[in-house]
A protein has these predicted regions:
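Conserved glycine-rich beta-strand-loop-beta hairpin in the small C-terminal domain of fold type I
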Residues: 273-281, 293-305
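A short helix->loop->beta-strand "cap" motif at the edges of active sites that frequently abuts
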Residues: 98, 119, 178-181, 205
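Short, conserved charged micro-motifs
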Residues: 310-316, 351-355
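N-terminal small-domain helix-loop-helix segment of the aminotransferase-like
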Residues: 1-84, 88, 366-367, 376-377
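Conserved core segment of the aminotransferase class I/II
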Residues: 205-274, 281-282, 318, 365, ...
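Active-site phosphate-binding strand-loop segment of PLP-dependent enzymes
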Residues: 127-194
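PLP-dependent enzyme catalytic core of the Aspartate aminotransferase-like
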Residues: 322-328, 333-377
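PLP-dependent aminotransferase-like
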Residues: 92-153
């Protein structure tokens, strides 16, 4: 069987399980705000979906996104999820002979997009407690060359959950400007951070900000995101994007409603996921050989190290899956460091997080007896 078929069947089985507790994909499973639900049902009942939405997105949504990120002089291209935006950016702004610089670990798919464009990918290792599990200014300075076309930074980092300071972002932007590289700042998780700085503040001419509604608003299955950059860059990216006919209008109505209620609704979402983080840390401390790498995470997940417990991440994933709990093996993010950890999402009902915690000692014990697992994705 081809790998794409195996992968699809794997996720179809997970998706078709109504009892599954999703703690593996950083998705948000808290109840949707009533006004967001109403916006979607109103759009469906009005049968707006018969027509194509505006190609760059609803004007109201574009305005609200800019307000949310505080980049009033920028422009917005609404996309079918942040990942479509990343595909567009990597394929159009990179190319043969160019260097694409990113971190290891980080998010894997832009690496694939850059390679498909012909770029040479340079991954800078950051999985090291001695440097706080973060990219250093010296590392980036040493990695870039005159061939560097793109610097891609997930901030907060997925999977580690570290968030960069304003001084670090400013220094990274200066390095990008010096070599003439695009700074692709993937801010998918910035809403969860205590403090966050947009690279475009320092480098508006060649910064590209990636925005998502999947994680903070819980719209992963609706596929809605955005690219934010100066108007000249958006003009280039809007010329031939993967979708030229406008994004899902129902999704856009949900996003508009979400941004309007965000100030009143989201603080409690973040409080609840931080509560889940604290409970997971407490549970992990009670199991010999297990530890959380970064706490508090500035995103909605935790890296839980299991290498010193004498188990593989895959075995632990397999053990939990039998309990209808999905967590993610580290190799999804990084072949180099993935053998060390699993990732556990925290924007989930408290009962789900508690179920993970209560079962942890038994799952670790069970994982020690699991020597082989089926393919995981």
């Amino acid at each position: 069987m081809h790998q794409f078929e195996s992968k699809n069947r794997y996720f179809d089985e997970l998706f078709s399980n109504p009892a599954l507790m999703w703690l593996g994909q950083n998705t948000n499973h808290f109840d949707t705000h009533p006004q967001v639900l109403q916006a979607m049902t109103d759009s469906i009942h009005a049968q707006e979906y018969h027509a194509y939405a505006p190609p760059a997105g609803l004007e109201e949504l574009r305005r609200l996104v800019l307000e949310d990120v505080g980049l009033s002089d920028a422009s917005v291209l609404v996309t079918d999820g942040a990942v479509e935006g990343l595909y567009n950016v990597c394929r159009n702004l990179s190319g043969p002979g160019a260097e694409f610089v990113t971190t290891d670990p980080g998010w894997k798919w832009p690496i694939g997009f850059a390679r498909a464009s012909g770029a040479c990918v340079i991954e800078i290792p950051i999985y090291d407690p001695k440097q706080g599990y973060r990219l250093t200014i010296a590392q980036l300075e040493a990695a870039v060359t005159e061939r560097t076309r793109m610097i891609y930074l997930v901030d907060p980092n997925n999977p580690l959950g570290v968030c960069y300071t304003a001084a670090e972002i400013e220094a990274f932007a200066k390095i990008a400007r010096r070599v003439g590289a695009y700074f692709v700042h993937d801010c998918t998780y910035f809403h969860f951070a205590d403090h966050h700085t947009m690279a475009a503040t320092f480098y508006p001419e060649k910064s590209v900000t990636i925005y998502s509604f999947s994680k903070w608003l819980g719209l992963a299955g609706l596929r809605i995101g955005a690219i934010i950059a100066n108007a000249d860059l958006i003009e280039r990216l809007a010329a031939a994007p993967p979708n030229i006919l406008g994004c899902n209008v129902v999704s856009q109505r949900a996003a508009v409603a979400g941004l309007k209620i965000k100030k009143d609704w989201f603080p409690d979402i973040n409080r609840r996921q931080r509560r889940n983080q604290a409970e997971i840390v407490k549970a992990v401390k009670g199991v010999a050989g297990m530890k959380v790498a970064v706490y508090p995470s500035q995103a909605n997940f935790l890296v839980v190290e299991c290498i010193d417990a004498g188990i593989t991440p895959e075995a632990l994933v397999d053990a939990y899956r039998a309990e209808n709990i999905m967590i993610r093996q580290g190799t999804y993010h990084t072949p180099t460091f993935g053998h060390r950890f699993v990732k556990v999402s925290t924007t989930v009902p408290e009962a789900w997080a508690d179920a993970f915690c209560e079962r942890l000692p038994a799952m670790v014990a069970k994982a020690r007896g699991i020597k082989e697992t089926a393919a995981l994705f």
